[in-house]
Amino acid sequence: METETGKGATAPPAESSGVEQDTAAVGAPADQPPKTNANATSNANGEDQPANGQKANPKDPSRPRRKKARRACFACQRAHLTCGDERPCQRCIKRGLQDACHDGVRKKAKYLHDAPDGALMPGIGGNNFYNNNSMSNGVPSGGINMNGANTVNSAASTQNSSANFYPTPQSNYSLYQENPINHQNSFPSQSPVSPTFSLKTNPTPRNTAPNNNNNNALTSSMPQPATTGVSNAPNQSQNPFAGPFFDPSDPALFNFDLSSMNFENRYGALEFGMLGHMATGAGDSPDSGTHRGSMGRSGSTQFASTPIGGTTTFGESPQNQQPFMFGDPLLNEWPSGQTSGQPHVNVGVYPQSSQGNVIPGHLSKPDAPHAFAIESGPNNFTSPGAATSPQINSGGYEDANAFNNVVTKSNGLSVNGQQRPPTISTPSLKHQSLQMNKRRHRNPSAVYESVKEPYAYTSRFHSLTAFIQRRFSPQKTLQIAKALASIRPSFIATTKTLNRDDLIFMEKCFQRTLWEYEDFINACGTPTIVCRRTGEVAAVGKEFSILTGWKKEVLLGKEPNYNVNTGGSSAANSRNITPRSSVESTGRPHPVFLAELLDDDSVVEFYEDFARLAFGDSRGSVTTRCKLLKYKTKEDMEAAQSDDNGQRWNNHLRKGGIANEAGMNQLGFKDGKVECAYCWTVKRDVFDIPMLIVMNVRLPLP
């Protein structure tokens, strides 16, 4: 009976294919003579049978059924034969094709047509770290050692190396079976923001235990001649995922077996592995910076032109590390933009130094990880208010001119780690920045220190009464007097129990409230004016001055008032065109009354509404139409009477209408009145007495 050589126990009928015809010419290796089976024969299907001619029981324990491989090699795939997980597989070893044994290429799915072929491989060389024959004596079963030599997997190898991707409590959330790392290895790949990887030909053993395996670790070569490696920290097992966390060019990116995850493509395995990295520390609260769930601090290489002490690395023990910002070491390094040879200083949220300095002593070590987080850059994380943030040189706020003494570099970072304030080019932003700088010096405490006397409301009410009698006709004066008389008893009742200290406190409340309103007026683009309960202007916006032509200094009584426009006709008597100086007999300047800014009918209507809101609805408001009087001197009134000016103003309306500040200034040029709508309300003080009249003005809709 003729026997066949080189056939497996369960060889399918394709043994006579073209691939096997080529291997027949090659023959078996010299050091592995062909085996014969005297007790077995081959049937027509190529299956071995016992000598009695009966087919063996497939469930016989002495003949276990071969497990189907996750991916067949190229030769077995082409011959449609059962392959194994190991590389080279047993069939290729028997045929002498161990050097050419590699994973076969499957047909890509439609959604993976754009993916590169290399990314669809389950692992480099199809390594399976969970297989018993995958690793032997530190040499991968693929037959390729890290130093470049090709080896053949020995069938007698019994020692294996496995990776626990799913961590157990005994592994302390570690990705590996941990031992102190005291070995080095490199990969010939480099990332633009990562250390330079160099190729070492003699990897050192991981430890001296009997079951030692020659695994490999990552080392970094520095730009300077000297090289530094990973620190031999005794607590390295406490820090999984050390080193550069996300470096696409690093071959040891995730350090777990992708082929063992039973994924058809590399994309899915990487995504699942990334989620596993994040989940391993999701429930932890890093207290010493040793690990952060998905990234550790130790294990990375140092980056300094001169190592401190010669052995200062990133593998520090927990007691030597500072508590990171929110337990995250990357948050301390957002604005880092230094080169690899430049020392970097991290500033934590809570300074730990007892000498009063902002920077703890151990933070001055130039050991920052030389990598940026995803989508981060040197200048992408400049906080708004960088000029007022705690800087490196002092523990308090620095002045704005302190940046003039700092020598900065082209990348926007200064020598001592400070950042230049962001450049503002937009005019509106420049104005806003200047306003912020001005408001920074304003202190509300000055309000309480400056007010020493109560405000003379009685004398100002007398001045208002005299002005009303001088300007308005007797009929309209009577209407205004009736409105004020209706609220006079309420004023007397609320003020009769107030002493001098109460009146001073009332004025302090007024000034403090006005201090807040000034910021609102500057930020709001609506014409706004704020008056006391006597009607005196206390604050005004720039837009109101543009609309009416009244200067802010004139309204506040800081400049003389030469206005002669009272809203009457040209035939008015002489008292209506007599200018009233803001400096009266007392010699003190006084603000303009609100009644001087409105025409006669609007003033009467205003005081009638004021009598209703003064002690009525505290949240009520009035919205109505009015006519504001433009600020006009005697020369302006004479010029407005000429026909040429009137014709020119009519032509202006027909051509371009109202536009910009110049167009607003032309409003009311002919008759000296600006018809508009306004909304105003009354704000009361702590004694429930009317304190402020806040008025917003806008042009009516056409």
From Swiss-Prot:
Residues 73-101 bind DNA. SMART domains: GAL4. The keyword Nucleus applies. Coiled coil: none annotated. Residues 34-55, 165-200, 218-240, 297-320, 565-585 have a biased composition (Polar residues). It is found in: Nucleus. GO terms for cellular component: nucleus. The keyword Transmembrane helix does not apply. One of its GO terms (molecular function) is zinc ion binding. Keywords: DNA-binding, Gluconeogenesis, Metal-binding, Nucleus, Transcription, Transcription regulation, Zinc. GO terms for biological process: cellular response to starvation; gluconeogenesis. It comes from the Eukaryota. Residues 1-66, 159-246, 281-320, 565-586 are annotated as: Disordered. Residues 201-217 have a biased composition (Low complexity). Transcription factor which regulates nonfermentable carbon utilization. Activator of gluconeogenetic genes like acuF, acuG and acuN. Belongs to the ERT1/acuK family. This is Transcription activator of gluconeogenesis acuK. It comes from Emericella nidulans (strain FGSC A4 / ATCC 38163 / CBS 112.46 / NRRL 194 / M139). The gene is acuK.
